[in-house]
């Protein structure tokens, strides 16, 4: 996803790490506690869509908090399916994605409402079709179900939506669970590999503008001020949510020769 093809797929120990500047374009983002919010901003949505898909490709957004990914997918001539739990959120997404669009564009948009446990039943008609699937793994969306070995809930369901060559993007980041720091990245990598996916890249999506080679913390999204004010664990310093971590996986055209073996170096440590 960055650099030459030989750089991306050469059998080296450390995967490429890229930084994307994704500061929101003036919109006010939702507030939440403990640094949970890791929004897909407009610039981030466009970067993901143009990097991972082509015109008329299918984008699937699972449990979005807002319209950013869906609306940008339509604007970039992609088809898009999304499932949300809250009917009010579904209404906002539909309105923002279709207002001012012609009938052909509106037919590209599929917004469904379903209970959390029925999410992938609502998306069953998209299995094997998606060029890009985006899911979130934040402290508010941390799965309640674990596998036999106690690891994070499998990513098999979102992986099943992918067409061969399609990409799964997991939006996550270090956060607090019950007052303790939690890094979900190693468990997510293992879960994706069990689902038959190949780990491509780690993207750091920076939410604040950069000035003089530094993130301007005073201009971070609205949830930063709230997260700074929260009582936090003594194990980590008080911090602003300056970025999210994006883990990008792909569904190979044939099963990986060494599924379950992580080529990601330090991220498995």
What are these regions (language model features)?
Residues 1-269:
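Class I S-adenosyl-L-methionine-dependent methyltransferase catalytic core
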């Amino acid at each position: 996803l960055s650099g030459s093809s030989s750089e991306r797929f050469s059998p080296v120990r450390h995967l490429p790490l890229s930084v994307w500047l994704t500061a929101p374009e003036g919109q006010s983002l939702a507030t939440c506690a403990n640094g949970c919010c890791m929004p897909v901003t407009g610039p981030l949505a466009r970067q993901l869509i143009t990097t991972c898909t082509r015109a008329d490709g299918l984008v699937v957004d699972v449990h979005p908090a807002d319209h950013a990914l869906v609306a940008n997918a339509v604007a970039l001539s992609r088809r898009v399916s999304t499932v949300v739990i809250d009917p009010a959120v579904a209404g906002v997404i539909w309105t923002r994605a279709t207002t001012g669009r012609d009938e052909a564009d509106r037919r590209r948009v599929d917004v469904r409402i379903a209970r959390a446990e029925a999410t992938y039943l609502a998306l069953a008609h998209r299995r094997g079709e998606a060029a890009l699937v985006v899911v979130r793994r934040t402290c508010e969306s941390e799965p309640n179900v674990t596998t036999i070995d106690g690891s994070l809930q499998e990513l098999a369901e979102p992986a099943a939506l992918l067409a061969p060559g399609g990409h799964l993007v997991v939006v996550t980041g270090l956060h607090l669970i019950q007052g303790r720091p939690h890094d979900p990245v190693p468990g997510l990598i293992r879960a994706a590999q069990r689902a038959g996916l190949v780990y491509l890249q780690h993207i750091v999506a920076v939410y604040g503008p950069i000035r003089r080679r530094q993130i301007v913390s005073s201009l971070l999204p609205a949830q930063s001020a709230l997260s700074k004010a929260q009582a936090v664990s003594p194990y980590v310093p008080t911090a602003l949510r300056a970025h999210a971590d994006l883990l990008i996986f792909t569904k190979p055209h044939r099963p990986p020769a060494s599924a379950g073996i992580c080529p990601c170096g330090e991220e498995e440590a």
